[in-house]
From Swiss-Prot:
Motif (Nuclear export signal): 91-100, 117-127
One Pfam family named in its UniProt record: Flu_C_NS2
Protein task: Mediates the nuclear export of encapsidated genomic RNAs (ribonucleoproteins, RNPs). Acts as an adapter between viral RNPs complexes and the nuclear export machinery of the cell. Possesses no intrinsic RNA-binding activity, but includes a C-terminal M1-binding domain. This domain is believed to allow recognition of RNPs to which the M1 protein is bound.
Top-level taxon of origin: Viruses
Lineage per the UniProt record: Viruses, Riboviria, Orthornavirae, Negarnaviricota, Polyploviricotina
Subcellular compartments: Virion; Host nucleus
Protein name: Nuclear export protein
Major subcellular location class: virion
Coiled coil: none
Subunit (UniProt): Binds M1 protein. May interact with human nucleoporins and exportin XPO1/CRM1.
Annotated S-S bridges: none
Source organism (scientific name): Influenza C virus (strain C/Johannesburg/1/1966)
Amino acid sequence: VKSTNLMAFVATKMLERQEDLDTCTEMQVEKMKTSTKARLRTESSFAPRTWEDAIKDEILRRSVDTSSLDKWPELKQELENVSDALKADSLWLPMKSLSLYSKVSNQEPSSIPIGEMKHQILTRLKLICSRLEKLDLNLSKAVLGIQNSEDLILIIYNRDVCKNTILMIKSLCNSLI
């Protein structure tokens, strides 16, 4: 329940700041919202809650003013802890602002000069992509042993995140070539 409230709260806050999100991140946050709504329906059949109830519960639990995100580092850390339970940091990944800019040069990928920098970026992206593919494979194996529906939903969500991130990285690699 606590992680569902947190996910509902974070998704709502991210969607309120839509102008700061790129399209891919916005789609990931929408998927997280859909996944969280599904969790709300399945987590307790005796006391069903709505999306708004989950957000209100999280706000009350944290005593957070809805107009500020002063406690954002704590929210981020708690969400990462939920992800660490699966030994994967892919739950937080969609909420990081994924932009198509190089941290080194702050240039658009198409304007990065040919040479060593572009080669290093491509090499790192391919390494990240291969690790995400391995994570996706491990998550697909983990699904077989799951007996808890909440864990199953979380693993399926994380597999979707992995697949979408892999597609974004491959698209970025193609734009660099």
